[in-house]
């Protein structure tokens, strides 16, 4: 499947343009000696907004990672968005990770809920319940419920979500973006088998987070 998005995310184009104009102006006035920190900033902004295509595993019961980052939680927890006990797997994204979010499963969206909140360090546990967040609840064709929650972080102050309740989602489909360091929590039915461990580096779409019970 072709990835229908530019390799540099559209969300970053205004920031890249501003950084490029500033670097060019300072270079023109003061030369490279004054401008090099601004060129370095431009490189950072470009790499932050990269959005590469990723291979998508074919296993039908696989739950794919929704974001690049590092696993900070694998535990049984309450899923407040679907009112159930669930297997919770959390991915923390630092400022050097790709920050687009992609659907972990095929299914239909039953609910999208936004919650205002704080901007605590997204790596800590209470960020899941206290930070600004946006939950997307997905029902698979087999009746399983999968919840993916975008969570703002200490620096990230803007959650973008491009889907609505009632719409279909395909595994690996890009559905959102969080700027500048953040977290995604995934809640799965009890009985799902986690395929990752705390501290593991993971990649959106290509890493299998868990397998749903068949």
Curated annotation (Swiss-Prot):
Residues with site note (Cleavage (non-hydrolytic)): 181-182
Top-level lineage group: Bacteria
EC main group: lyase
Membrane topology: Peripheral membrane protein
Free-text description of this protein's post-translational modifications in UniProt: Is synthesized initially as an inactive proenzyme. Formation of the active enzyme involves a self-maturation process in which the active site pyruvoyl group is generated from an internal serine residue via an autocatalytic post-translational modification. Two non-identical subunits are generated from the proenzyme in this reaction, and the pyruvate is formed at the N-terminus of the alpha chain, which is derived from the carboxyl end of the proenzyme.
Residue positions, PTM Pyruvic acid (Ser): 182
Reaction equation(s) it catalyzes: a 1,2-diacyl-sn-glycero-3-phospho-L-serine + H(+) = a 1,2-diacyl-sn-glycero-3-phosphoethanolamine + CO2
GO molecular function per UniProt: phosphatidylserine decarboxylase activity
Principal subcellular localization: membrane
EC number(s) given by UniProt: 4.1.1.65
Active site residues according to the UniProt entry: 182 (schiff-base intermediate with substrate)
Swiss-Prot/TrEMBL cofactor(s): pyruvate
Bilayer-spanning residue ranges: none
Pfam families reported for this sequence: PS_Dcarbxylase (PF02666)
Cofactor note as given: Binds 1 pyruvoyl group covalently per subunit.
HAMAP family: PS_decarb_PSD_A
Record-given protein name: Phosphatidylserine decarboxylase proenzyme
């Amino acid at each position: 499947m072709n990835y229908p998005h530019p390799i540099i995310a559209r969300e970053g184009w205004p920031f890249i343009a501003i950084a490029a104009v500033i670097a060019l102006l300072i270079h023109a006035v003061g030369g490279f000696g004054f401008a090099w920190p601004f060129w370095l900033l431009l490189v950072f902004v470009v790499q932050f907004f990269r959005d590469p295509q990723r291979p998508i595993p074919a296993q039908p019961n696989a739950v794919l990672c929704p974001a690049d980052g590092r696993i900070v939680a694998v535990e049984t927890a309450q899923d407040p968005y679907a009112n159930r006990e669930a297997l919770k797997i959390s991915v923390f994204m630092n400022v050097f990770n790709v920050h687009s979010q992609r659907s972990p499963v095929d299914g239909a969206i039953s609910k999208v809920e936004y919650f205002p909140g704080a901007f605590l360090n997204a790596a800590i546990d209470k960020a899941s319940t206290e930070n600004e967040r946006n939950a997307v609840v997905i029902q698979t064709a087999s009746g399983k419920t999968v919840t993916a929650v975008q969570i703002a972080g200490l620096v990230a102050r803007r959650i973008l979500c491009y889907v609505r309740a009632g719409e279909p989602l395909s595994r690996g489909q890009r559905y959102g973006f969080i700027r500048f360091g953040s977290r995604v929590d995934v809640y799965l039915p009890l009985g799902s088998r986690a395929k990752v461990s705390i501290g593991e580096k993971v990649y959106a779409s290509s890493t299998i987070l868990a397998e749903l019970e068949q």
